[in-house]
């Protein structure tokens, strides 16, 4: 079995998978959303303290399975440094105690493998990665090498939802609550936001301007009613999704994708999923979607990504395993 450990942000998660059959032996995640909600976002120091409690508790659940573990896969990049260190420290200690190999997993690569939790990975593949920390269009070639085609210059897709939710006092995280309120909209033409970089040829995303447009409209309201909230959420969500699709259409003209995947916590947005289905049908491209319950951070995807390295014997020494809060991929240049 392969043990997966995830602690890159505010989710503590542990998973066990069979490296031969991909059977999920154990999976559990402890979310910190409730603890961070009162602050309107993730507080790194609090996240670190909560990981120190949650990870040992999760490990305790699988004590009887430790003798059957053949390798440990752990997220070491990118993420919050104080969060990453919790998972990496536990992985190192277990690896030494059990005398089994250690595998370093890039968190973003883990998200890509959320598309293949129950099957073999097949490349080449185009991927849209949308989360609270990242917005990227990636290309993975036949050898599994990753090229970044586009990314955001400021806020991420998911982060913009969190910030709009905070402006409207809807709580944290914002993705689900903004989507739910958007569905209550009765006047779809009331607010019109400009799609960022609409006529800009650069393969780049930017959500800060859209966020400011929302702030301006909110400031014009003397009091904010439920109808106001629903109408604003609808206009914002639609514009944010349109921004994603606008750049994707440009990428599809440059790359003849036959298969395209969508991953990351924000990929659970139903509006975005529907638009991507239309885009892929238009381009005769197979759309791969991560299961809704595994869009957000989880240890299953880390174990799954680690399994690929396990068979290639891409292990890492304890002394060489470090955390890298910020890390990217090779960038595409037009």
Curated annotation (Swiss-Prot):
<feature type="binding site">
    <location>
        <position position="269"/>
    </location>
    <ligand>
        <name>substrate</name>
    </ligand>
</feature>
<keyword id="KW-0408">Iron</keyword>
<dbReference type="InterPro" id="IPR017861">
    <property type="entry name" value="KAE1/TsaD"/>
</dbReference>
<protein>
    <recommendedName>
        <fullName>tRNA N6-adenosine threonylcarbamoyltransferase</fullName>
        <ecNumber>2.3.1.234</ecNumber>
    </recommendedName>
</protein>
<keyword id="KW-0479">Metal-binding</keyword>
<feature type="binding site">
    <location>
        <position position="162"/>
    </location>
    <ligand>
        <name>substrate</name>
    </ligand>
</feature>
<feature type="binding site">
    <location>
        <begin position="129"/>
        <end position="133"/>
    </location>
    <ligand>
        <name>substrate</name>
    </ligand>
</feature>
<dbReference type="InterPro" id="IPR022450">
    <property type="entry name" value="TsaD"/>
</dbReference>
<dbReference type="GO" id="GO:0002949">
    <property type="term" value="P:tRNA threonylcarbamoyladenosine modification"/>
</dbReference>
<keyword id="KW-0819">tRNA processing</keyword>
<dbReference type="GO" id="GO:0061711">
    <property type="term" value="F:N(6)-L-threonylcarbamoyladenine synthase activity"/>
</dbReference>
<comment type="function">
    <text>Required for the formation of a threonylcarbamoyl group on adenosine at position 37 (t(6)A37) in tRNAs that read codons beginning with adenine. Is involved in the transfer of the threonylcarbamoyl moiety of threonylcarbamoyl-AMP (TC-AMP) to the N6 group of A37, together with TsaE and TsaB. TsaD likely plays a direct catalytic role in this reaction.</text>
</comment>
<feature type="binding site">
    <location>
        <position position="175"/>
    </location>
    <ligand>
        <name>substrate</name>
    </ligand>
</feature>
<keyword id="KW-0808">Transferase</keyword>
<dbReference type="InterPro" id="IPR017860">
    <property type="entry name" value="Peptidase_M22_CS"/>
</dbReference>
<dbReference type="InterPro" id="IPR043129">
    <property type="entry name" value="ATPase_NBD"/>
</dbReference>
<keyword id="KW-0012">Acyltransferase</keyword>
<dbReference type="GO" id="GO:0005737">
    <property type="term" value="C:cytoplasm"/>
</dbReference>
<feature type="binding site">
    <location>
        <position position="297"/>
    </location>
    <ligand>
        <name>Fe cation</name>
    </ligand>
</feature>
<comment type="similarity">
    <text>Belongs to the KAE1 / TsaD family.</text>
</comment>
<dbReference type="Pfam" id="PF00814">
    <property type="entry name" value="TsaD"/>
</dbReference>
<dbReference type="InterPro" id="IPR000905">
    <property type="entry name" value="Gcp-like_dom"/>
</dbReference>
<keyword id="KW-0963">Cytoplasm</keyword>
<dbReference type="GO" id="GO:0005506">
    <property type="term" value="F:iron ion binding"/>
</dbReference>
<feature type="binding site">
    <location>
        <position position="111"/>
    </location>
    <ligand>
        <name>Fe cation</name>
    </ligand>
</feature>
<feature type="binding site">
    <location>
        <position position="107"/>
    </location>
    <ligand>
        <name>Fe cation</name>
    </ligand>
</feature>
């Amino acid at each position: 079995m392969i043990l997966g450990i995830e602690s890159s942000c505010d989710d503590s998660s542990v998973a066990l998978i069979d490296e031969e059959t991909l059977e999920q032996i154990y999976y559990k995640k402890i979310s910190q959303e409730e603890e961070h909600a009162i602050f309107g976002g993730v507080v790194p120091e609090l996240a670190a303290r909560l990981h120190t409690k949650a990870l040992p508790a999760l490990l305790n659940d699988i004590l009887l399975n430790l003798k059957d573990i053949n390798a440990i896969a752990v997220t070491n990049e990118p993420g919050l440094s104080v969060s990453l260190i919790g998972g990496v420290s536990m992985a190192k200690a277990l690896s030494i105690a059990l005398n089994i190999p250690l595998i370093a997993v890039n968190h973003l690569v883990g998200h890509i493998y959320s598309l293949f939790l129950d099957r073999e990975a097949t490349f080449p593949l185009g991927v849209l990665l949308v989360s609270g920390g990242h917005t990227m269009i990636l290309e993975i070639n036949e050898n599994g090498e990753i090229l970044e085609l586009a990314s955001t210059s400021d806020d991420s897709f998911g982060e913009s939802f969190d910030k709009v939710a905070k402006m409207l006092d809807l709580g944290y995280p914002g993705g689900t609550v903004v989507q739910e309120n958007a569905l209550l909209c009765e006047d779809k033409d009331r607010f019109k936001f400009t799609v960022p970089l609409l006529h800009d040829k650069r393969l780049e995303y930017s959500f800060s301007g859209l966020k400011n447009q929302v702030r301006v409209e909110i400031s014009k309201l003397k009091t904010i009613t439920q109808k106001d909230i629903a109408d604003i959420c609808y206009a914002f969500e639609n514009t944010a999704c349109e921004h994603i699709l606008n750049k994707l259409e440009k990428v599809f003209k440059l790359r003849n994708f036959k298969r395209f995947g969508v991953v990351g916590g924000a990929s659970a947005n139903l509006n975005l999923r529907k638009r991507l289905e239309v885009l892929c049908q238009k381009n005769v491209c197979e759309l791969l979607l991560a299961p809704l319950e595994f869009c957000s951070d989880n240890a299953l995807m880390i174990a799954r990504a680690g399994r690929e390295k396990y068979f290639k014997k891409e292990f890492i020494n304890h002394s060489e395993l470090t955390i890298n809060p910020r890390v990217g991929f090779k960038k595409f240049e037009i």
